Amino acid sequence: MLPYNSNYLSDNGKRKFSDENPQSEVYGSSQTGLPSSYGNPQSYGTPPVQQSSAMYGVNNSMGGGMYNTSENTQFMNTDYSQTSSYASTPMSNAYSRDAPAAINNNFGYSYVGQSSQPVPSYNPLPSYNTASLPNAGIPAAMPGMPSGYPGTVPIPQGGYNAHYSSPYNNGYPIGAVNPTSAIPAQPPAQPVNNVLPSYVRSNSRSSARSTARSAPRSTQRSRSSSANPVTTPPVNNTLLTPPAPPVELPPVTTTSPNAIIRSVQWIRSFVPQAPIHQVINTLAQTKWDETAALSILSQKYLSCDLGIPIQEHKRFKQSPVASNMPTYGSSNRTVQSQKRSIRDKYIQMPNDSTQASLMPSYTRKTSNASKKLTTEEDEFYDSEEEPEAIVHRDTSALERTVLNFINSSTAKELSDTASCPLSHSKLLLEHRPFQTLAEACIIKHPDDVPSKPGRRGRRREKNPMGQKIVNACMETMEGYYAIDNLIAKCEFLGNRISKGMASWGIKLEMSNGELNIVDMESVPTEAADNSDFPKFVTEQPKTLASDVQLKSYQLVGVNWLHLLYQQKLSGILADEMGLGKTCQVVAFFALLLEQGHHGPHLVVVPSSTLENWLRELARFCPSLRVEPYYGSQQERANIREAIEENEIKYDILVTTYQLATNNKEDRSFLKHQNFDVCVYDEGHYLKNRMSERYKHLMNLNANFRLLLTGTPLQNNLKELVSLLAFILPNMFDSDMDDLDVIFKAKPTADADIEQALLSKQRISRAKTMMTPFVLRRRKNQVLNDLPKKTQIIEHCKLSENQLEIYNRYAALQKNQQLRRDDKRNKRSKNDEESDGKSLSAGHVLMQLRKAANHALLFRKFYDDEKLKQMAKDIMQEEQYKNANEQYIYEDMEVMSDFELHRLCRSFPTLQSYTLKDDPWMDSGKIRVLKELLPKMKEEGSRILLFSQFTQMLDILEQVLDTLKISYVRLDGSTQVEVRQDIIDQFHKEEDVTVFLLSTKAGGFGINLACANVVILYDCSYNPFDDLQAEDRAHRVGQVREVTVIRLITDNTIEEYIQKLANTKLALDMSLSSDGKDREEIGERLVQDMLDEENNGNNTKPEITGNESDGEFKVSSSNNSKQTDAEETNTGVPLEGSQPNSVEKTDLADGDEKANIKTEMKSETVEGDNKELRETMKGENVQTDSNAAVPSSKSSTEEPNESVLSGHLDLDTEASPVVSTIEKTTKGDVSVTEEQQSANIDGQLEKPEIEESKKPDVLNQVSLSIEEEKPKNKESEVDNNAAKD
């Protein structure tokens, strides 16, 4: 039996199984057991073998004493350094060097099903291999020997070599010689071709090295005695001729020696009677098929066929799990992994001599040692100089201002300014007028409870209500003064920019708060020559690539950036998405490079756009040396070390927001680079001055800061000041403490503090002051040839499974609404209970959205009994053998049907539990897609399919597989290194029809202009997210008309979300807060809609109010035209909820997790404050081509001068973008919109829709906004902005 994983065939395997060799005349010389040519000590020094304690002539190679000769070297085992005697038997040598210690059976192991079993061994006798008689190699009747074992016939003895005195090997063992012939002593003959030529491992190691390693030390000392260290047996040597008949073997070209040895080993474990040469011959005949050879040999020696059971055994036990499972077809073409890192793909080699001669010499900007080093105490001061001391105003003057304000303000204004309840401000004003602030400070609230005793029994005096209000007003007023002071400073700086642009012949209009210079026509060819300002650059930089041609508005943008840079100021480039902001920035870098400004510069981008930036920089300006600062922690450490040691020289360093802010080492490295220009892509990430991201990035030193954003500036004083503080940090250092008082103020239950901050006068001044620092152009202004964008709403119906699930959660929401109404007045006093109920309410809203999407997002098909059986069955899998069955069952309980289906497809033991009959096709929206997608594919359209939920993307993958439509996918879990590869794949492979994207990860910063259809499978609470997704296709480079299709499920929560997005209120909301705040507010508004519908007996609510001052109220309309058929489909009426804390984990996240919490309080108060209660009555639609959006009775009114609400005073002069909503094939009424102001700023004109033209459509009623007198506020919102 063969030893496991050994090369015992180092002798037997090299025999030429042929009788063609001539017979020798004489045996080897006396006492050698070998022919004289192999064993003559006179010719070759020493005997080739030595006495061994191992049985049957296997030499104990560890004992040393062996000498190498040119003939016997080939019989060494080079793998185990084992030198066997020439005719060693096929058995295990437990004493050989490097042989496995566990293999100590005389005949090795029998391997059956990968488990070793000993084979019966020979009965050891003391006379074995001692060979006291010359011909006693192995006796013919050895006990314990398997029947049919070859070579048990005594071997005749020939002549002896007197110089060879080995007492143990006087005779030839089994199969070593032909017992019918004798071999004369002769010199070595020429080597012959080996039957297994690959045994000589010339490819893996040299023969000399193999020989030197396998031979004992004495052999190495006498190496010079052999001219040829490795040879093959002589041609005329018949010692290699076995008793078996010869078989011509095909040449072995693909089977390695080790593989053949393992095959022989495995076959003989089943059929030990088969001779080794017979096994090898059979393997050669079957082309080295182990199972086929075993089948032949087992039938010959065992009279049974072992091939069939062995084949089944190997297939199940040795093959991968996937081979035992059904093959599931997939149309997924997504790139799975990258071949190179981002740095390897985009790092640039040093420029050649030609390019270098055109550019100025590289100079590295070094820090000044004399300057103050930034420490942890002053890390939030961006300037390296000592910050100026904060100068406070005269306290007496501030007190007089506050006193006058208290004596003249209304209760609501005082409540907003002091952040106190409205009832407290009313009580204070009942005692006015006040002569001094001391009189106001002593006013107490009648319900004030005396303070509790302290530890030592003393009572702490609580501040009276009046003193709290006075202190809060003084802090707020001081913040107002700081803002006014900053606005005055910014106006002074802005005048410098205005003069510089005036030198070009451009007259600025300061009314809109932003520049909108479009083309070169407004720039005179010969502007006034002013040495204080740079000249207008009329030609693009020469270092730009030859195939890059800047448009006129882009060249204007480069000049504007250059002007700000020369004046040592900063700015915000806020062009609409798709207008080439990246190209303008690269051209600006190229212009600086031509002027000798090598930086270093920094570009901070979102993770999803990192590779796109690197590609654009390399494409637009190859002369720039760009270094990506991205990778693992060790890779970044290597980059830092190389840069600090000046081994890497760069002009631009590109990194991500996450790396620039999260890790301390990264922050410290970037902080000390002393950048010249810092560019922040998606600059709206920096609107929250209290976020950690803002603070860390403010710490980066830079001479010029540029924010890029497609998001418009908003009528939010906190955001405007935050952006100003970021781009002009030196100016804001001394006033930040005063500003923090305003920023940290929390809204009350009665009113939002922003209602006091967002006065018309201050907003107007702030935006006027920011005008020179903000450049924004819109698509309709610069791209007259941009294809139009068509909006289509596809109405879908709930399937039976969806309807059942939806009604269940709608009923649950109704019960929660009733419980909340009972405890409405106690919510503010019992926060813990309120928090718990609100979490459930938010969970129900999420479940309603999921039910409107697909039933497989829930667990219905897999009941508890089936899950228990599945948990039991999966325990048979290898990776679950040691798992806890109960834990597995509990994990399965929280999984959806589709997640369980995918789990079943992954394991052979669960194949029977997979879903049958394609239930993923059973959904209202999927039915619509089933009709749309094949038609679009035939037309050659390419589709972007967005969804908020990653689980929904999983289901859509299965749908596309069923429809045989190829696709790629990108979501928040996609590796950053692969994202650009997937985008490139979609661009290049035109046969890929669909691109699946999550709205968060795929809706920002990527260019997919090769697609002409955008399908929004579900809508976001934040309408701006959907607009961003649309602009992935409707952008520069698009040559086809773009169609945007929204899938809306009738009579569900999605109708409310869509109606919210179509109102001016929603647009105001989207422009007055951060992204997370927008989702929070949107969710709260939808909840209020549902609440109003339920409270009004299922009547449709109506928004009324004064559009001009941004105030809205809620009223219920009884003009509902809902039919019985509609109520049947709707099921249980929806009940809204106002959660205190809603945590959403189901949404598909992009580079950040969406962990959104919204806190709301509801308290009924009295007063003449205005209501801000949002619900929706319905949406007007019209088939006339001139109708655009829901009607607004006050849409033609001019805005008032004062806006005290938190909503934007919209610009009604914005040019519209042509957008047409066509009628769908489903028979649903849709809207045709002409001249809809659908730009990103949310400036939406709402033309009047005549009553006579309003169609009678189910679930769609008019939205009216009208003025009303202020009423009591019944519902207030406490929105704590989540950190960016």
From Swiss-Prot:
Residues 201-241 have a biased composition (Low complexity). GO terms for molecular function: ATP binding; ATP hydrolysis activity; chromatin binding; DNA binding; helicase activity; nucleosome array spacer activity. Residues 818-831, 1143-1177, 1243-1256, 1266-1284 have a biased composition (Basic and acidic residues). Residues 1-10, 20-57, 320-339, 353-372, 1095-1107, 1180-1194 have a biased composition (Polar residues). Residues 562-730 form the Helicase ATP-binding domain. Keywords: ATP-binding, Chromatin regulator, Cytoplasm, DNA-binding, Helicase, Hydrolase, Nucleotide-binding, Nucleus, Phosphoprotein. It catalyses: ATP + H2O = ADP + phosphate + H(+). A motif (DEGH box) lies at residues 681-684. InterPro entries: Helicase_ATP-bd, Helicase_C-like, P-loop_NTPase, SNF2-like_sf, SNF2/RAD54-like_C, SNF2_N. Residues 928-1079 form the Helicase C-terminal domain. The keyword Ubl conjugation does not apply. Coiled coil: none annotated. It is an enzyme of class 3 (hydrolase). CDD domains: DEXHc_SMARCAD1, SF2_C_SNF. One of its GO terms (cellular component) is cytosol. Residues 1-57, 185-252, 317-339, 353-388, 446-465, 816-839, 1088-1284 are annotated as: Disordered. Its EC number is 3.6.4.12. GO terms for biological process: DNA double-strand break processing; positive regulation of transcription by RNA polymerase II. The keyword DNA-binding applies. Belongs to the SNF2/RAD54 helicase family. This is ATP-dependent helicase fft2. It comes from Schizosaccharomyces pombe (strain 972 / ATCC 24843) (Fission yeast).
